[in-house]
Amino acid sequence: DPKETWAFITWTMFAIYLHTRTNPNFQSANSAIVAFLGFIIIWICYFGVNLLGIGLHSYGSFNLH
């Protein structure tokens, strides 16, 4: 299911973000880049996956007719 896959990708990205924030070896710019990528992934998960219209949650897809 694409929504579950992209939700997993989102959770993974923000787990990476939390690890970059708590690890003193990484600079703050690295965590800002990861947070920005996580924000982009959230937009893909919210809008892009709904445009696919496949999977178990296809009732929540946009109609482009």
Curated annotation (Swiss-Prot):
InterPro entries in alphabetical order: Cyt_c_assembly, Cyt_c_biogenesis_CcsA/CcmC
Ranges annotated as spanning the membrane: 5-19, 32-52
Classification via Pfam families: Cytochrom_C_asm
Keyword list, A-Z: Chloroplast, Cytochrome c-type biogenesis, Membrane, Plastid, Thylakoid, Transmembrane, Transmembrane helix
Membrane association type: Multi-pass membrane protein
GO biological process annotation, one example: cytochrome complex assembly
Disulfide bonds listed in the record: none
Parts forming coiled coils: none
GO cellular component, one term: plasma membrane
Location within or outside the cell: Plastid, Chloroplast thylakoid membrane
Entry annotated with the keyword Transmembrane helix: yes
Molecular function as annotated in GO: heme binding
Highest taxon listed in the record's lineage: Eukaryota
Oligomeric and partner information: May interact with Ccs1.
UniProt similarity note: Belongs to the CcmF/CycK/Ccl1/NrfE/CcsA family.
Function field: Required during biogenesis of c-type cytochromes (cytochrome c6 and cytochrome f) at the step of heme attachment.
Protein name: Cytochrome c biogenesis protein CcsA
Organism: Oenothera berteroana
Lineage, opening ranks: Eukaryota, Viridiplantae, Streptophyta, Embryophyta, Tracheophyta
Encoding gene (name): ccsA
